[in-house]
C-alpha cells in the first residue's frame, strides 16, 4: 500500500510539471508584436490603366441598346482609349528613422501614387527610390519631420530550419494581422516563377494576398526577410510561403540607393538537373551539380572554356547541390569578378577560373 501511495504521490507531482512545462518552450509572440508592429506599414497603390471602348451613336444608351448592332454593322466603329485608376495594396516596413521603407516590387510596380499608412493611422505619400523586378525588392521613402519607428535587420544566414518566425501584414486589407510558424527550408529556388535569382526562405507561416512586402521576424524581433509569395493551387494559403532573405535584400537596397539599378553576374549557360541516371552514366557518384546543356556564344562561360556536358560542382567556392543553386550564386557576384569553379568532365574533376560578366536586361 505504501508503494502504491508513494507512486501516486510522484505522479501528482510530475503531471502538473509536464502540463506547464510546454509553455516555457513556446515563443513569446505577444511582446514581439508589441515591440515591432508600429514600424509595419500598409502600402496603398494607385495605378492608371488604359482601356478600350467602342463609341456608340447613342451616347448614354443602356448596354445592349437594340440599335447598337444596327449602327455598328457592318462597319467597326473606332475604339477609344480611356484611362482609369485602379487601387491595390500590400505591406511594408520602415527600416530607418529617416523614412526608408522596404516592400516588394510587385506591390508598387507601375504605381502613379503610393500612400503609406501606419498602425496609428498616420498617412504619408511615398516616393519610389528604386525597384528591382528580378529580386522583387522595392525601396520607398517618406519625407517627414515626425518621429518614425523603425525595425532592426537581423542576419538571415543564421536562421535554421525549424526556427520559429512571425509575420505581420495586411492580408485581404485586414491591416496589421499577425501569423506565426516555422522555417521549412532555406535557399529555395523557384525558377518557374521567374525568380531564379532569389534564395527564398520557405516557411509555413500563413501568407495571403496583401501580406506581400511585409516583414518576417525571428524571435528577437529582427527582420530576417520580406514576405513575397505563396505556393497555391487556388490562390489562397496552403502552408507553403516564400520570403526574400534580408541579407540578400540588403545587397539590392544598397545598389538601389547608390545607383538606382541592380547589377548581376552572368555566366551565359543553360543548365539542367543531374538525375541519378545521369550521375551513374557520368560515374559522378551521388547526383549533384548543374549540367550544362548550352553555352552561349561569346559568353563568359565560353571564354572560360566551359562546354556542353560539363557538370559544374562548385562556383566561387560554393557547392552546387541542385542546378538551381548556380543562378543564385552567379547572380550575387559582382560583374567582372574572376572566381574559381570546379567542373566534372569525362570522369575527371577539373578546376577553372571564370570571369563573370554582367547580366543585361532584355528590352
Predicted features along the sequence, with ranges:
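A general secondary-structure boundary signal
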Residues: 310, 338-340
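Residue-level detection of beta-strand scaffold positions
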Residues: 311, 351-352
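Hydrophobic helical h-region of N-terminal Sec-dependent signal peptides
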Residues: 9-13
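Serine-dependent protease modules
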Residues: 20-281, 285-288, 293-297, 323-327, ...
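Conserved PDZ fold ligand-binding element
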Residues: 101-105, 300-323
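Bacterial N-terminal signal peptides that target proteins for export
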Residues: 1-7
Amino acid at each position: 500500500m505504501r508503494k502504491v501511495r508513494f507512486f501516486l504521490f510522484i505522479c501528482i507531482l510530475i503531471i502538473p510539471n509536464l502540463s506547464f512545462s510546454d509553455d516555457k518552450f513556446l515563443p513569446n509572440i505577444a511582446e514581439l508584436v508589441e515591440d515591432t508592429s508600429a514600424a509595419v506599414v500598409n502600402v496603398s497603390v494607385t495605378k492608371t490603366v488604359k482601356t478600350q471602348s467602342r463609341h456608340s451613336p447613342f451616347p448614354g444608351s443602356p448596354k445592349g441598346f437594340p440599335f447598337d448592332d444596327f449602327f455598328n454593322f457592318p462597319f467597326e466603329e473606332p475604339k477609344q482609349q480611356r484611362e482609369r485608376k485602379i487601387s491595390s495594396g500590400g505591406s511594408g516596413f520602415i527600416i530607418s528613422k529617416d523614412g526608408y521603407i522596404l516592400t516588394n516590387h510587385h506591390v508598387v510596380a507601375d504605381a502613379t501614387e503610393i500612400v503609406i499608412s501606419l498602425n496609428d493611422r498616420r498617412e504619408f505619400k511615398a516616393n519610389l527610390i528604386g525597384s528591382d523586378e528580378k529580386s522583387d525588392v522595392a525601396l520607398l521613402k517618406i519625407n517627414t519631420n515626425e518621429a518614425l519607428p523603425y525595425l532592426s535587420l537581423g542576419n538571415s544566414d543564421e536562421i535554421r530550419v525549424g526556427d520559429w518566425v512571425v509575420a505581420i501584414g495586411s492580408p485581404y486589407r485586414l491591416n496589421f494581422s499577425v501569423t506565426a510558424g516555422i522555417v521549412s527550408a532555406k535557399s529555395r529556388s523557384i525558377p518557374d516563377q521567374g525568380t531564379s535569382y532569389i534564395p527564398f526562405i520557405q516557411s509555413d507561416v500563413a501568407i495571403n494576398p496583401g501580406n506581400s512586402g511585409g516583414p518576417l521576424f525571428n524571435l528577437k524581433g529582427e527582420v530576417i526577410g520580406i514576405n513575397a509569395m505563396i505556393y497555391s493551387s487556388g490562390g489562397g494559403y496552403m502552408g507553403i510561403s516564400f520570403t526574400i532573405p534580408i541579407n540578400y535584400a540588403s545587397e539590392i537596397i544598397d545598389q538601389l540607393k547608390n545607383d538606382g539599378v541592380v547589377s548581376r553576374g552572368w555566366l551565359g549557360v543553360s543548365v539542367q538537373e543531374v538525375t541519378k541516371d545521369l550521375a551513374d552514366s557520368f560515374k559522378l557518384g551521388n547526383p549533384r551539380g548543374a549540367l550544362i546543356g548550352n553555352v552561349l556564344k561569346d559568353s563568359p562561360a565560353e571564354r572560360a572554356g566551359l562546354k556542353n556536358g560539363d557538370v559544374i560542382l562548385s562556383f566561387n567556392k560554393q557547392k552546387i547541390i541542385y542546378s538551381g543553386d548556380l543562378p543564385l550564386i552567379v547572380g550575387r557576384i559582382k560583374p567582372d569578378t574572376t572566381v574559381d569553379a570546379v567542373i566534372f568532365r569525362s570522369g575527371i574533376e577539373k578546376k577553372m577560373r571564370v570571369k563573370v560578366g554582367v547580366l543585361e536586361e532584355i528590352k
